[in-house]
C-alpha cells in the first residue's frame, strides 16, 4: 500500500512574496497590499487559500507546522481529514491573539501562537500523544499519531540553531521509535537542519533506520519500516501560489515537501 506524505510549515498562515521589496512596514502596519508585475503581498487572513491548496494536493498524511491554532478545524474539514493538533509556543492569550491575527496576521506574526497539526485521510486515528521537548527558548512539542492501519506519524518543529535542533531531533526520534514499537513510522516536519550541514541524519539512519532526508531542505520526511516509493522532494515555488486580483500570492516562506512510501 502506498502512503503519500506531505510536510509544510505554514508560516503562521502568511504569504511571502519572492520580491523582498513587497514586504513593507507600510503593509504590515496599514494592511495595504503591495504589488509588482507578477506578485502581490497581502496582509489578511488566508485560511481559505491555504485550505484550497491543501485540499487539492494528493496526500494521505500531512504534517503541518506553524499552523494557526484557530485553523485546525477549517483545514481538517476542507481536506476531509481526521486531525491531531498540539499547541507549541506563544499560546498564552489565544482568544486575544487569534482575533488580532485574523485582522492583521503580519503585524502579530508568530506571536499569535502556533501548533503542529497532523491531518490524515482515508483512515481513523487510533491514538494521539505528545512529548514536550523543551520550554525555552521556545516550547517545542512532538506529536505522535497512530492510525487505524497501524502506521505511526510523528510531527515535529525543531528548534534552531543547529545544536538545539540536533537535540530536539534526537530526543523526538528516540521517543518516536519507542512509541511506534514494531509498526511502520513516518517521522518528519520542519527539522530546522539541512542534511548537508549536520551528521544527525546519518546517525538517525544508522542507529534508528530513519531515512531519507530531503536534499537541500530543512523540512524532512523520514521513514522506518517502509520502502521509499518516491524520495522526498521540495515542491516548486509556483506550486504554493494562488491567484488574487490577477497576481500570484505565494503562501508561506517554506516549500512543502512530498514523498511516497510503500507499506
Protein language model annotation of sequence segments:
Residues 1-78, 85-97:
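N-terminal, active-site-proximal structural segment of metallo-dependent hydrolase catalytic domains
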Residues 10-13, 68-70, 89-91, 124-125, ...:
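Short, solvent-exposed loop/turn segments at secondary-structure junctions
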Residues 17, 72-75, 79-81, 165, ...:
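Short glycine-/acidic-enriched loop or helix-start segments at secondary-structure transitions
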Residues 35-39, 129-134, 154-164:
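Surface-exposed cleft-lining segments at the edges of enzyme active sites
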Residues 65-149, 237:
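Structured beta-strand-rich core segments of catalytic domains in phosphoester-bond hydrolases
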Amino acid at each position: 500500500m502506498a502512503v503519500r506524505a506531505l510536510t509544510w510549515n505554514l508560516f503562521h498562515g502568511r504569504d511571502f512574496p519572492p520580491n523582498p521589496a513587497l514586504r513593507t512596514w507600510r503593509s504590515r502596519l496599514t494592511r495595504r497590499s503591495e504589488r509588482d508585475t507578477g506578485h502581490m503581498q497581502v496582509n489578511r487572513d488566508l485560511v481559505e487559500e491555504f485550505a484550497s491548496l491543501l485540499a487539492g494536493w494528493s496526500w494521505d498524511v500531512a504534517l503541518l507546522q506553524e499552523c494557526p491554532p484557530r485553523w485546525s478545524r477549517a483545514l481538517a474539514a476542507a481536506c476531509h481529514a481526521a486531525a491531531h493538533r498540539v499547541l507549541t509556543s506563544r499560546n498564552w492569550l489565544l482568544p486575544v491573539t487569534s482575533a488580532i491575527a485574523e485582522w492583521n496576521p503580519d503585524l502579530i506574526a508568530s506571536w499569535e501562537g502556533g501548533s503542529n497539526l497532523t491531518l490524515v485521510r482515508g483512515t481513523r486515528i487510533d491514538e494521539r500523544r505528545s512529548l514536550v521537548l523543551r520550554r525555552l527558548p521556545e516550547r517545542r512539542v512532538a506529536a505522535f499519531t497512530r492510525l487505524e492501519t497501524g502506521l505511526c506519524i510523528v510531527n515535529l518543529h525543531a528548534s534552531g540553531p543547529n545544536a538545539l535542533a540536533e537535540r530536539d531531533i534526537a530526543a523526538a526520534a528516540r521517543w518516536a521509535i519507542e512509541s511506534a514499537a514494531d509498526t511502520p513510522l513516518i517521522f518528519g516536519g520542519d527539522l530546522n537542519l539541512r542534511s548537508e550541514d549536520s551528521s544527525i541524519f546519518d546517525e538517525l539512519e544508522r542507529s534508528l533506520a530513519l531515512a531519507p532526508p530531503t536534499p537541500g531542505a530543512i523540512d524532512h520526511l523520514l521513514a522506518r519500516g517502509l520502502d521509499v516509493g518516491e524520495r522526498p522532494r521540495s515542491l516548486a515555488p509556483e506550486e504554493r501560489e494562488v491567484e488574487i486580483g490577477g497576481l500570484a500570492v505565494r503562501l508561506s516562506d517554506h516549500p512543502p515537501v512530498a514523498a511516497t512510501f510503500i507499506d
